[in-house]
Amino acid sequence: MKKITLLLFFYSILSCGVKQSTNQLNSGNYDEAINIAVNSLRNNKNAKGKQDYVYILEEAFAKAKERDLRNIDSWSKDANPTNLEQIYNSYVQLNRRQELIRPLLPLKLLKEGRDAIFPMDNYSTEIIDSKNALSNYLYTN
């Protein structure tokens, strides 16, 4: 009886974690969904019971990256120097997100028989350029 109760307890905790990360993903809190999924996948990332986290992580990563790049593009076109800090912070966030996921790779999607797709880009040039532009702006003003 104790074993059954213990198993039900752990199952409920695991299902709540998936539900919580799904809610974060659906509400647009992509970074929080990524953090929840990464923390869950740190131990035994290829376990069948953790496949939901892999799907959530793949979708949240793609949506967060797309949102950040769209915002950067918009801020760059605006050419308003007050946006330089947001541009710099977005590039740093893009890089941080990749470095958070990189140790887990490759992640398998067992149902589809493929690896999860996480397109990694090198943002070091953009980070340095935006940091220099921000520094110049702050220095002159």
Where is each model-derived feature located?
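Alpha-helical solenoid repeat scaffolds, predominantly canonical TPR units
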Residues: 24, 36, 87-90
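Bacterial Sec signal peptide processing site at the extreme N-terminus
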Residues: 10-34
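Positively charged n-region of N-terminal signal peptides that target proteins for export
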Residues: 1-4
